[in-house]
Amino acid sequence: MINNRMKKHGMTAYRTRATFLLPMALSLIICHLSLSPARAQRQLSSVPVGSVKWTGGFWGERFDVLSKTSLQSMWETWQTKEGKGFNNFLIASGEMQGEHHGPPFHDGDMYKWLEAVAAVYAINKDPELERIMDRFIGCVVKAQREDGYIHTPVIIAELNKKKKEQQDGNDDTVVGTATGTKKDKAFGNRLNFETYNLGHLITAGIVHKRATGKTTLFDAAVKAADFLYDFCQRAPEELAGNAICPSHYMAVAEMYRETGNKKYLELLKQFIDIRGMVENGTDDNQDRIPFRQQYNAMGHAVRANYLYAGVADLYLESGEEQLMKNLTSIWKDIVTRKMYINGACGALYDGTSPDGTNYTPDSIQKVHQSYGRPYQLPHSTAHNETCANIGNLFFNWRMLEATGDAKYADIVENCLYNSILCGISLDGEKYFYTNPLRMSDELPYTLRWPKERTKYISCFCCPPNTLRTLCEAQNYAYAISKDAIYVNLFGENTFTFKPDGKNEMTLAQHTQYPWDNKVLLEVVKAKKAVNTVIKLRIPGWCREVNVSVNGCPVPYDREKGYIAVNGKWKKGDVITYSMEMRTRIVEANPLVEESRGQVAVQRGPIIYCAESPDLGDIDIDDIAIPVDTKFTPVEVVIDGSRMIALEGEVVVRDEETWKGQLYREVSRKNERRTIRLIPYYAWGNRGKSEMTVWMPAVY
């Protein structure tokens, strides 16, 4: 009766663990004996590491800051009194003595930083970066167990235990040493984040190999992946409960691509299958029910988006149609009901799950840093963890690879320019953990995370994740198919590749995007003319485009948000691509109560905000924007970074204080004033400030 009611109202019928545990176990046995042949469904492929290089412009400036300041600054942070991440590896490798310090996921955070260093090294071949990587990798290799397991809290505790037992004359137990174990304690507590750490080790090892040609870290990554495989075969249910922020899903998918070993693809499928084996699963961790029964985004936004990216990887390599049904439904739920205008995800700091709570009060669960109900998108209390926004990028990139549809590339671009770039200061040394749409000093409560950018946060997952994502942003600029080159992002860069598999060609983009609407795509190197199709993305915010080749307008086809330009390309050929880039006044769906009657401002891919340093005596609460306001682009410099701000006339309402009132009669006192809006990613770089993206509309 209850299940019928739930189906009638479009709700998921929650099965008990007993109803699916046996079939799930049987499916795992079958999967282990014979994995069905993969039917890859990839439409696009990523470009090789190092094949795209920023040469100037917006992303060239950001890459310079990241490569010359951010990486070294974070390396120093890892060795400070607060950070101590590197000290943990020194102790675990036997180079020094001591106790573990910091959260259990610090290992994974250091691996993310290492991945960022490797990505930069692939571009600039800086010997100092190579030296730093070699120093850290040496500790990782020495700390890793022979069976591939590595988790510095466990390794350090066991080394210290062994030392004490030797001192006491009782050398009976050695758990987690290089010689093996008598009792495997791995994955005893899901909040130890062991699979998260191992996943980032595997990914870092692959990127390091591709960037340097060395296999020192890659060999450790293979051992870690093999450890996960072996453990999953003997204790799948135990491993099922240890998939918090499942970076290991994407990691083993990439290991399969790197090695061609199908056991890693088998392992990825098992990871998704065993999620249904979790006893007392939660919506917060997306494991209350099996994944293939999930059609809406739920729970902790980082965990969710990493899960969706990992499942998309499985679809790319297996072609399982059911997975695409789940992913398409979840994507639509996010983009049309749960995503912020800046591409950010995860509206709630803390709350209760909107799923599975009907009819049975005992089933109500807590959630944190999570998706909320549809259209629940608060401004000041938006959590929007940078890691969740990065996960949104990962998910959409894989959906782009699966479909070749530019709507996914639109979100990749939105996240990069707005909700991810906002996570790091312009000088490259300070970070936000959360990314609200509004910051006001008037709120009478304290939120969990700092209102100012800071160099070190106790929960340090976002800073290195931001670094690696931005250091690898060039890899999203292009994608390739069997017969075309896809141009997804615009910026000053060069891209060297072999369109026909034999003859090398180098394309160069010349542009001041995102501030200017024109992009020149030049063939700067080609040994011989090559027939291929170049596909240029039409941004979702753009109404009109123009394209010409060598100064002459050319016919083109539109398909899935791309312009297809056919040609036999030779050195010196130039495509000129212009996109309409006007300032847009944007409103939200009226079901978003927090944004009703308000508007935001966007120009190109950039979301704008009002920040107190630009407002003088104007309070952010008193600004209203006439919907017919004409904003003028003006060049400004904030903390050494050039950008385009917008200036326009707005209505400034009466400045009377509320004096503790909750309601009062509307005041019609107002005046017209000209104010400046800055890019959202740049706020918070001039000290503590107030800020808002959404402002009341005047119609």
Question: What spans do the regions from the language model cover?
Answer:
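Bacterial N-terminal signal peptides
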Residues: 21-34
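Low-complexity, Ser/Thr/Pro/Gly-enriched N-terminal "stalk/linker" regions
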Residues: 39-109, 134-174
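Solvent-exposed loop and edge beta-strand segments that line ligand/cofactor-binding
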Residues: 41-44, 93-110, 126, 163-165, ...
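Well-ordered alpha-helical scaffold segments within catalytic/enzyme domains
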Residues: 51, 57-61, 65, 112-127, ...
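Aromatic-lined, polymer-binding surfaces characteristic
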Residues: 146-147, 193-210, 217-257, 300-301, ...
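Catalytic-core region of carbohydrate-active enzymes that cleave or remodel glycosidic bonds
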Residues: 316-337, 377-429
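C-terminal beta-rich recognition modules with glycine/proline-rich loops and embedded aromatic residues
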Residues: 327, 409-418, 423-525, 558, ...
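Solvent-exposed beta-strand/loop surfaces of large extracellular or lumenal domains
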Residues: 542-566, 585-591
